[in-house]
């Protein structure tokens, strides 16, 4: 049985691609969005729930909107934002935004496990990043300098907290660590250990490839309770 997906971050760059990929593969999808969004597709397998991803009550509402009897996988593609793509651009999201959402997801998951009715959650799949945890040591010197001297440090700090929160939670997880993102077409990915040992000097992966991998991680058990680094 295909798991159904609760998608958090469906209106973002990667989230939109995850949504399209999941629907194409036949998954039932519930998207938690902050406000009604006309950019989401009209699809028989898509349910939209309005709410705050950092509010456990709203996340619980979304989980209880899923179809009973079908296991749920939660995918989060939330990310820190800045006023532009420049690493030194001012942050436009709260400093601990992603970690607040991870905590809300875990709290809501505990609530729905108690029922009634009971919602079966198989795992939590999070789009993390290359540089978190033990992968930081394998960033090249240019990337390490950028993380240490630009506003990307807020993103790394938040993702590091998410990593810790999810590992300390009660759900099985996959913490996917994509390398440098680009807009190329989807291509096969190479999966590295969490440390990213063996990646090239300036590794790249397309956003489309990441979206496909996140949906793969939702439906397969190959990477459960790990933090795979992925690159094309």
Where are these regions (language model features)?
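Eukaryotic N-terminal targeting leaders
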Residues: 1-6, 20, 39-42, 231-232
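N-terminal Rossmann NAD(P)H-binding glycine-rich loop of SDR-like oxidoreductase domains
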Residues: 2-28
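SDR active-site strand-loop-helix element
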Residues: 8, 32, 74-78, 124-130, ...
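Hydrophobic anchor at the start of a short beta-strand
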Residues: 29-30, 173
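Glycine-/Pro-rich loop/turn segments that contact NAD(P) or position catalytic residues
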Residues: 85-186, 190
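C-terminal/domain-terminus segments
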Residues: 183-204
């Amino acid at each position: 049985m295909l798991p159904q997906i609760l998608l958090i971050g469906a209106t973002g760059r990667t989230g939109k691609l995850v949504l399209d990929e999941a629907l194409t593969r036949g998954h039932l999808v519930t998207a938690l969005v902050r406000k009604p969004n006309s950019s989401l597709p009209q699809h028989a397998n898509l349910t939209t729930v309005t709410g705050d991803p950092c509010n456990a009550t709203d996340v619980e509402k979304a989980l209880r909107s899923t179809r009973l009897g079908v296991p749920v996988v939660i995918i989060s593609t939330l990310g820190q934002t800045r006023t532009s793509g420049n690493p030194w651009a001012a942050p436009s999201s709260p400093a601990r935004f992603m970690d607040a959402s991870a905590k809300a997801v875990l709290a809501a998951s505990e609530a729905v496990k108690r029922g009634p009715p009971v919602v079966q959650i198989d795992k939590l799949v999070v789009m993390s990043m290359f540089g978190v945890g033990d992968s930081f040591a394998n960033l090249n010197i240019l990337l390490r300098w950028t993380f240490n001297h630009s506003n990307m440090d807020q993103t790394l700090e938040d993702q590091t907290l998410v990593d810790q929160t999810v590992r300390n939670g009660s759900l099985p997880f996959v913490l996917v660590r994509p390398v440098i993102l680009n807009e190329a077409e989807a291509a096969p990915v190479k999966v590295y250990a969490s440390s990213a040992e063996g990646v090239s000097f300036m590794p790249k992966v397309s956003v489309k490839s990441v979206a496909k991998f996140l949906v793969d991680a939702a439906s397969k058990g190959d990477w459960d309770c790990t933090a795979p680094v992925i690159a094309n």
